[in-house]
Amino acid sequence: MRFDKEKSVLIQAGKNASRIFIRYYGKTQKIKQKDNKSLVSQADLEVNKTIINTIKKAFPNHNIMTEESKFDDQNSDFTWIIDPIDGTHNFVRNIPICGISVALKYKKDIVLGHIIMPAMNINAFAQKGKGAFVNGKRIKVSAKKELDNCVVVYELSYNKRHEKIENLKSFSGKPIDLRNFGAAIYHLLLVATGKADAFVIFSTNPWDVAAGFVLVEEAGGKISGIRGKSYSLSDTKFLISNGRLHGQLLNLLLR
């Protein structure tokens, strides 16, 4: 399938969402803390609403999975996966590392991914089998083959944080540069563009990673569970890399 209409709707949804993001960014707004200690802002809710409305107008019978509302199951082969604002903590503190993530899954495959970070002027898009692009330029993962001085970004959630920090000790004593920027979409873009060599996630949700996964894979990267098995979006722990370092990093994580 070519997914031409789906691609057009995805891009329009991104444009609509970006306008709301920009309207709220840097402004004081209502903030709530969810049960899992993450934040939700008024901007999250409005961005979520406009993306859903844009998609539903074109595809009323498609499934929609989003962070900020219940799963809309229409028993369709098509599922839209939405994170209206990834990096909400950054967003509400006016840190520009935050943005919008929308993906389309057809049956078992993520076929389209769109990440927009308006405060950083980043517009990323990928289609399965057709490459990954940032601001219209094709991107690719790094060519690094050795662990020495490689850059690994990581993601920790609030739940069982101590346990997850223990997992990072696998990298202690190694010449690896560990970084965390507070937004999964940015971490995935860093790997997809070759600015980081790998990304380790110890707890996540499908909407955090779906769009970024197709970007990484189309840029030549590799994704697996942190035990090396083939991944599913229902998993919560992942290793994402340039592919060349994947085996070496898995060996560290399996210790």
Predicted regions mapped to residue ranges:
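N-terminal subdomain of lithium-sensitive/metallo-dependent phosphomonoesterases centered on the IMPase/IPPase/PAP
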Residues: M1-I85, R244
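DPxDG-like acidic metal-binding loop motif
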Residues: Q74-F133, C150
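Residue-level signal for inorganic ion chemistry
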Residues: A17, F21, D44, I55, ...
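An extended, acidic
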Residues: K140-R255
